[in-house]
Amino acid sequence: MTIRTEKVASLLQKELSAIFEKELPRSGPLMTVVQVKVTTDLGIARVYVSIIGSEKERKTAIAHLQNETRYIRKLLSAKIRHQFRRIPELEFYEDRLYEKAERIDLLIKQALGTSK
């Protein structure tokens, strides 16, 4: 990533985190913006969201985010419209890194426990 795309991604992550915290209704599981990746033409922003909840809640939350993309983009536009000519399209993805880390930790503990 270039310096510009990194700066844009960082700004988008900060602003989207604020939107998730303050402006979106909290009816489902806890969601946090983990990472934002922006294409080199700044046209698409891939937003990785960590969702704490059951499998069904996570799927519902991602579907809800994908349905509300236009609304979230409108809120984002109100915050950063003076810094960009064009607000990037948003694509939401579930970040499962925390879940994978827990699984690896459990496997390591099991392996150490059985080797004694």
Curated annotation (Swiss-Prot):
A single GO cellular-component term on record: cytosol
SUPFAM superfamilies from the UniProt entry: Ribosome-binding factor A, RbfA
Compartment annotation: Cytoplasm
GO biological process: maturation of SSU-rRNA
Gene3D superfamilies reported in the protein's UniProt record: 3.30.300.20
InterPro entries, per database record: KH_dom-like_a/b, RbfA, RbfA_dom_sf
Keywords assigned: Cytoplasm, Ribosome biogenesis
Any one Gene Ontology molecular-function term assigned to this protein's record: ribosomal small subunit binding
Major location category of this protein: cytoplasm
Assembly description: Monomer. Binds 30S ribosomal subunits, but not 50S ribosomal subunits or 70S ribosomes.
Function comment: One of several proteins that assist in the late maturation steps of the functional core of the 30S ribosomal subunit. Associates with free 30S ribosomal subunits (but not with 30S subunits that are part of 70S ribosomes or polysomes). Required for efficient processing of 16S rRNA. May interact with the 5'-terminal helix region of 16S rRNA.
Family from the record: Belongs to the RbfA family.
Annotated protein name in UniProt: Ribosome-binding factor A
Gene name of the encoded protein: rbfA
